[in-house]
């Protein structure tokens, strides 16, 4: 829980997060296919394992890239929002899996029976959300 609170505080301090959430509701207005391809390339270039440092580097590189600065200034906010969403999801996945395993396995599991079966499905649904949300956003952007 401390990890979640510290991540929430760090994300809340970013001014772009508010704009990112606003623009993420309809990204087709702000991106074209070329911009999404370039943002994806920059995403993997700037990722170094630290969410905050990677996000800052991503914004710096994206602002300097002429392919991404052609559109409105809110493009950076949406890209940052998607970047942070994916990074937090990747970082929290092992934590969720280990907590589910601790609750449902071992010599004296705390959750048994049908509830354990349902609890074991939580990581699967979490992974589906991590895949579906960026895919839907990318589809809406590509459709434009």
Swiss-Prot record:
Transmembrane segments: 76-96, 118-138
Membrane association type: Multi-pass membrane protein
Keyword Transmembrane helix carried by entry: yes
Residues excised as propeptide: 1-71
Pfam families (UniProt xref): VP1_VP3 (PF06281)
Keyword Transmembrane helix: yes
Recorded GO MF terms: structural molecule activity
Subcellular location: Virion membrane
Homology family: Belongs to the fuselloviridae capsid protein VP1/VP3 family.
Protein name per its UniProtKB record: Structural protein VP1
């Amino acid at each position: 829980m401390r990890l979640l609170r510290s991540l929430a505080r760090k994300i809340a301090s970013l001014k772009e997060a508010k704009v990112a959430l606003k623009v993420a509701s309809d990204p087709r207005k702000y991106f074209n296919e070329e911009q999404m391809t370039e943002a994806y390339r920059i995403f993997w270039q700037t990722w170094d394992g630290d969410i905050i440092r990677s996000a800052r580097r991503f914004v710096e590189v994206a602002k300097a890239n002429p392919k991404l600065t052609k559109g409105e200034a809110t493009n950076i906010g949406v890209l940052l929002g998607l970047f942070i969403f994916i990074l937090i999801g990747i970082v929290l996945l092992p934590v969720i899996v280990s907590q589910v395993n601790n609750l449902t396995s071992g010599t004296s599991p705390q959750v048994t029976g049908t509830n354990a079966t349902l609890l074991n499905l939580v990581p699967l649904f979490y992974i589906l959300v991590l895949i579906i949300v960026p895919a839907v956003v990318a589809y809406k952007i590509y459709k434009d």
